[in-house]
């Protein structure tokens, strides 16, 4: 039986999307807006007609991005624990960081996402320092992050979406000592058990450090994405429903694991803000996302489902 024809241009485009999606057929199909069966069929035909495409793509030094654009995860049943913006300094494990660790061991989530800005990168910032602030060295921040991360439950899927403060580490090296990049390594090399990426797609939920900003960041992120989103960066903790003829999806901002009053944020001069310590729990049932839940400080203690955690 002869192999069905497939245009070279179509094959090249399919193979490119497949490698860009880390050889995940479902993820490639989502990006191409085709069915999984269509993409799988095209890949099978491409392997028969143009096997050299796979060799060339596999041997290429880079697939366009320094980090994966998306890390795709499929869940039928289970929970996802998402926290961001710890802005870790040494000897400063906040009550919300402790609550995140404790709840991770109670819920035993399928996925833990550290949604960016886990490090602060105070001494490798492009912004000037405050006189007498005595910001910690980067190595001290990394060591403190390791100590806290070691207290977390360890699911198979551990994802770290890159935040702008996390980027300070690699950006400093790239701009000040690029000839040492292979020697010094990336931030991801310091945390090899974690999957570093710009965003992760969990079923039809997009988790990334930042997208829209402002007081309505959650709403606008979900509205313009067209799907449920979880973002950090703003330090706001809130859940906003976007409802239309297609149903409901959610714009979720996951607060911060750090302390808004810590000296790392002295640049804000102590003014009132919407920053709120907290994090997010998302549950899936039969592949469907349930309404998201938050953990936040009530009277100085973290609360989840009406109960104190710490």
Predicted segments, located by residue:
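Core catalytic region of metal-dependent phosphoesterases/phosphodiesterases
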Residues: 55, 83, 88-190
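Short Lys/Arg-enriched helix C-cap and helix-to-coil transition segments
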Residues: 47-67
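Conserved beta-sheet core of the metallophosphoesterase superfamily
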Residues: 203-297, 307
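Short alpha-helical "recognition helix" segments of helix-turn-helix
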Residues: 27-32
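Mobile, glycine- and charge-enriched loop segments
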Residues: 61-93
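Major-groove recognition helix of helix-turn-helix-like DNA-binding domains
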Residues: 34-52
């Amino acid at each position: 039986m002869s192999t069905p024809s497939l245009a070279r241009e179509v094959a090249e485009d399919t193979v490119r999307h497949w490698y860009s999606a880390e050889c995940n057929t479902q993820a490639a199909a989502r990006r191409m807006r085709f069915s999984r069966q269509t993409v799988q069929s095209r890949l099978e035909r491409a392997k028969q007609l143009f096997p050299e495409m796979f060799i060339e793509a596999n041997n290429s030094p880079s697939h366009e991005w320094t980090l994966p654009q998306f890390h795709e995860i499929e869940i039928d049943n289970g929970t996802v624990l998402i926290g961001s913006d710890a802005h870790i300094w040494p000897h400063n494990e906040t009550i919300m960081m402790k609550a995140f660790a404790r709840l991770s061991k109670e819920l035993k989530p399928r996925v833990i996402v550290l949604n960016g800005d886990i490090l602060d990168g105070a001494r490798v910032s492009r912004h000037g320092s405050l006189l007498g602030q005595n910001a910690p060295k980067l190595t001290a921040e990394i060591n403190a992050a390791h100590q806290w991360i070691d207290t977390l439950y360890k699911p198979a899927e551990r994802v770290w979406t890159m935040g702008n403060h996390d980027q300070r580490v690699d950006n400093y090296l790239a701009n000040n000592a690029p000839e040492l990049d292979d020697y010094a390594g990336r931030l991801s090399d310091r945390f090899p058990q974690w999957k570093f990426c710009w965003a992760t797609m969990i079923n039809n939920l997009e988790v990334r450090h930042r997208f829209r900003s402002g007081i309505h960041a959650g709403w606008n992120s979900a509205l313009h994405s067209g799907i449920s989103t979880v973002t950090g960066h703003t330090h706001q903790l809130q859940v906003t429903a976007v409802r239309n003829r297609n149903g409901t999806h959610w714009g979720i901002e996951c607060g911060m694991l750090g302390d808004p009053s810590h000296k790392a944020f002295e640049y804000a001069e102590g003014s009132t803000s919407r920053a709120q310590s907290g994090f997010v729990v998302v549950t899936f049932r039969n592949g469907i996302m349930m309404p998201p839940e938050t953990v936040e400080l009530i009277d100085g203690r973290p609360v989840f489902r009406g109960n104190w955690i710490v």
